Regions:
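Gly/Gly-Pro- and Ser/Thr-rich, intrinsically disordered tail segments characteristic of DNA damage-repair
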Residues: 1-226
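DNA-contacting surface of Y-family translesion DNA polymerases
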Residues: 190, 195-277
Length: 279
């Protein structure tokens, strides 16, 4: 069994740690020179704010609606991330740091002596108590199913941030509710091709013939399908392999024609990529 621990609105939540009065209020984080939005809370999204929105265009209306903005502080974010990962390494013997705000845990020993839902809630509460950071926990027999569980924990508030997919019935139920483009490893191009053959959700993807997947797509997607069926194909990487490249990217909401705005975004994502080197 695996758990995926994922921080909620990581950058915005880091800022809220020191400003508890901002709980449930719109928060955005701006690029290095306050040029555009690079992270935002759920409440800010509900106001219609989007990633890479130019700050000068939205500042007045956003502040009128009670929104708060912070300049990005990558040293702070890296420090809080390190604290969270240290906690996770105390809770599980094997941890894979997947990104600055995500980690996979090996629960093979835990599942023999503790209810996994209880473990997930203990994990959530411990991180909240020791760091002030909100997280969600997805639990499943494979890393891909743990990702599915994390999707459920984010999508459905009634889960209170923890979803355990030990049960096959629960796996099927949630996969039927999960759009195929949300599946870990399904990129935009593959998503379009899958939609073209009538595959709309994760469960429909899991039922495709593996030979068909290998011939029409690739072996990576075939592994994803096998993982959705509960077969472990992707093990934990406790020591990350040497990377030939580090990519941090986002899709702009509209065509960017302002060179200053483009420079702001490139500078910010370069800083994010650099922060990954130190994790």
């Amino acid at each position: 069994m695996f758990a995926l621990v994922d921080c909620n609105s990581f950058y915005a939540s880091c800022e809220r740690v020191f400003r508890p009065d901002l709980k449930n209020k719109p928060v955005v984080v701006l690029s290095n020179n306050d040029g555009c939005v690079v992270a935002l809370s759920k409440e800010a999204k509900n106001l219609g704010i989007k990633m890479c929105d130019p700050w000068f265009k939205i500042e007045k209306e956003y502040k009128q609606k009670g929104g708060i903005a912070f300049s990005s502080n990558y040293e702070l974010y890296a420090d809080i991330s390190s604290r969270i990962m240290d906690i996770l390494e105390q809770l599980s013997p094997r941890v894979e740091i997947y990104s600055i705000d995500e980690a996979f845990l090996d629960l093979s020993g835990v599942s023999n002596c503790l209810d996994l839902d209880i473990f997930g809630r203990d994990c959530l509460e411990t991180i909240k108590k020791w760091t002030g950071m909100p997280v969600r926990v997805g639990i499943g027999p494979t890393k891909t199913l743990a990702k599915v569980a994390s999707f459920g924990a984010k999508k459905y508030p009634q889960t209170n941030g923890v979803v355990d997919l030990s049960s096959k019935d629960r796996q099927i139920k949630l996969m039927k509710l999960m759009p195929v483009e949300e599946v870990w490893g399904v990129g935009r191009k593959i998503h379009r091709h899958l939609n073209g053959i009538g595959i709309k959700n994760a469960y429909e993807l899991s039922q495709l013939d593996l030979n068909f997947i290998r011939s029409k797509f690739n072996i990576v997607l075939a592994k994803t399908v096998r993982e959705l069926r509960g077969e472990v194909c992707i093990d934990l990487e406790e020591e990350a392999p040497t990377k030939k490249q580090i990519v941090v990217s986002r899709t702009f909401n509209s065509r960017i024609t302002n060179l200053k705005m483009l420079h702001e975004a490139v500078s910010d994502y370069a800083a994010r990529a650099l922060s990954l080197i130190h994790i």
